[in-house]
């Protein structure tokens, strides 16, 4: 047994969708989460800047003696995951390959849509991974740069959010049977997205799919947390104001959590 925590990094609050799924599937694991909300969104930023910020988050998590790092951010995964994975001697997971694999299994007509930040979409990484595994699948990608600010400002139920989602996703309506939510912020807009595309379109949460891989690696490396750990405690950190982060996190995780502000 290994009672060290699992480290999660994201550009802000979006990675909490991955944490929520981990708490459901692996409730005995401890969590350290760092959200860089002060510099969110990452999507419009240059790749080199995203790489620099990601390494700062990684180094922060390493000071917390984590046993594994999860890139709970598609943009950071697209830009820096391979590099970080090769550099560290602990397991490092990203969210893109699990999401791509799940989309291939889910599609009924071979028409998959991918939505994400500008950087994730321009990298072409989802299309590359999907067509590497399933060359006949048709992939339609769409950048949704206005989605992350909606989530970070906790306006996911507002009329403005509905208007933006409807306008942005209009090009995909009637053209896909499966949609990858290629940003961990997007599941927080899941209800609106489903309403726009219709109930026939299957939505793939790349972060939730990633948790299945976390479980596999914990078993493979024999680093599962103890179910009898009486000192299990989660820690959440943000580079922005802790009040806003705490409100979003407590609502999404359905429990009151403590959030600490950090400067990287």
UniProtKB/Swiss-Prot annotation:
<dbReference type="InterPro" id="IPR004391">
    <property type="entry name" value="Glu_race"/>
</dbReference>
<keyword id="KW-0573">Peptidoglycan synthesis</keyword>
<feature type="binding site">
    <location>
        <begin position="184"/>
        <end position="185"/>
    </location>
    <ligand>
        <name>substrate</name>
    </ligand>
</feature>
<dbReference type="InterPro" id="IPR001920">
    <property type="entry name" value="Asp/Glu_race"/>
</dbReference>
<feature type="active site" description="Proton donor/acceptor">
    <location>
        <position position="183"/>
    </location>
</feature>
<comment type="function">
    <text>Provides the (R)-glutamate required for cell wall biosynthesis.</text>
</comment>
<feature type="binding site">
    <location>
        <begin position="74"/>
        <end position="75"/>
    </location>
    <ligand>
        <name>substrate</name>
    </ligand>
</feature>
<dbReference type="InterPro" id="IPR015942">
    <property type="entry name" value="Asp/Glu/hydantoin_racemase"/>
</dbReference>
<dbReference type="InterPro" id="IPR033134">
    <property type="entry name" value="Asp/Glu_racemase_AS_2"/>
</dbReference>
<dbReference type="Pfam" id="PF01177">
    <property type="entry name" value="Asp_Glu_race"/>
</dbReference>
<keyword id="KW-0961">Cell wall biogenesis/degradation</keyword>
<dbReference type="GO" id="GO:0008360">
    <property type="term" value="P:regulation of cell shape"/>
</dbReference>
<keyword id="KW-0413">Isomerase</keyword>
<feature type="binding site">
    <location>
        <begin position="10"/>
        <end position="11"/>
    </location>
    <ligand>
        <name>substrate</name>
    </ligand>
</feature>
<comment type="similarity">
    <text>Belongs to the aspartate/glutamate racemases family.</text>
</comment>
<protein>
    <recommendedName>
        <fullName>Glutamate racemase</fullName>
        <ecNumber>5.1.1.3</ecNumber>
    </recommendedName>
</protein>
<keyword id="KW-0133">Cell shape</keyword>
<dbReference type="GO" id="GO:0071555">
    <property type="term" value="P:cell wall organization"/>
</dbReference>
<dbReference type="GO" id="GO:0009252">
    <property type="term" value="P:peptidoglycan biosynthetic process"/>
</dbReference>
<comment type="pathway">
    <text>Cell wall biogenesis; peptidoglycan biosynthesis.</text>
</comment>
<feature type="binding site">
    <location>
        <begin position="42"/>
        <end position="43"/>
    </location>
    <ligand>
        <name>substrate</name>
    </ligand>
</feature>
<dbReference type="GO" id="GO:0008881">
    <property type="term" value="F:glutamate racemase activity"/>
</dbReference>
<feature type="active site" description="Proton donor/acceptor">
    <location>
        <position position="73"/>
    </location>
</feature>
